[in-house]
Amino acid sequence: MLRSERDPQPGQDIRGRRGCEPVKREDFTTLTAACAKCGTCRTVCTLYPERKAEISVARGKITLVEAAFSDRDGNAEALQEALSDCILCGKCERECPNQVAVEEIIMKGRADLAEKLGIPAWKQVVFGKVMPSVTARNATRTAATAAQKVFLRRVPTGSGLHYRFPEAFGLSGRTVPALPGKSFLGSLPPGEAVRGEVVLFVGCVFDHVFPQVGRAAYETLRLSGKGISVFRDAPCCGLPALVSGDRLSALRCVEENVKRLSDASPERIVFPCGSCLVMFRRNMLFLLPSGHPLHGEAVRVADRCVDYASFLLETDVLSRLPDRPKGEWAGQVGYHDPCHLSGTLGKGPEGREVLRRTVGDSYSELRGAELCCGYGGTFNIRDYPTSAKIGQNKVSVAAGGGAAVIATACSGCILQMRDMAARTDPSLRVVHIAELVSKAFSNR
């Protein structure tokens, strides 16, 4: 049985709701039984080269989970530390010969441990109060915009103005993008609720931090000739809460999104962010399993979800672009494979095809395109030095291959690589593919 070295702190009450019950021992046994302890995971683990420890790889974590749910005593804090020390890049799961559901094991383990040991107060506020509410997110962005001008130092980079934390903050010189005065959704004229053939789910980061991405995606989607509407008051997709173990907050976001999108019944739901997409296509079904009242609706919603690049190719939007003049784009433009989008969902070729057709001769395969950027959501907060080391290697390899612009389709990857570029090569630009598509159309 799991034991704790301290008295369990009160966490959120997440019992009694289907899809949110603590995982039973037999469920973990079923998930972990497929692991043959072959060690393939160690050869591809993003963290192992930094940690050099068995506990950092899937095999080690699964062994700990098995021990915790056996007759042997298990230390809850030690297991929580081990399961938290993972970027969730999914490389181990994709390369596993037995297809062990590593990410599911880790996410469910984190959730059960969060219930036992409690969820930190700041996470309860962010995941339970801010992320589900558009009003709360807007208020948070307004406060953060004012605070960064007072406490942080301005740093110009190739990807735009950033702010750097002073060393006194203990954040090792981390940079963050300058927050705009208005969010993407805040810049739209008043409109109706979700409707139309196609719905754009812009996501929190592309609404508040990089509104130019939301705007570029919206403007280029409209060229498809389809009726496009924006999910204006959507809760967060729920992924940050889920991977942090806050099952209840994640479930609240997921249930609201499924109900709203099911009622609207669009043909397609388009996601500029690969992390939001993987939440809808796969992870939300961990929370709404067979037997949950919303399971059927969740499956139908998931089937309609598509990434931005795939939608452009489906609707042949790029056929309207003229041939691009040779040398129009300054320097080589390459595509970074986001772990969630390219790895988990297999959507790498689509992004490359959009990029080739957009920038023409300037496209070049990115050196180290498949390398993880090291962001990992809350992992970047939990262990910034390690996250930054992995990220700096990523952008250094790409720049060393001649890249002047890195294009991708994940908000976390863009946040991370812009931060790393500000450290290693401020001239290196990191953009979303929608920004390049929008620029190409504006230059017609």
Task: Locate predicted features.
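Iron-sulfur cluster-binding electron-transfer modules in prokaryotic oxidoreductases
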Residues: R3, V102-R444
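Iron-sulfur cluster-binding cysteine motifs and their immediate structural context
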Residues: A36, T40-A67, Q80, D85-D112, ...
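Glycine- and acidic
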Residues: F28-T30, T46, K91, V199-G203, ...
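Ferredoxin-like iron-sulfur electron-transfer modules
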Residues: C20-K37, E66-L88, W329, G334, ...
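Conserved glycine-rich FAD pyrophosphate-binding loop
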Residues: M1-T30
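Alpha-helix capping and helix-loop boundary segments enriched in small/acidic/polar residues
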Residues: A33, K52-S56, A241-L248
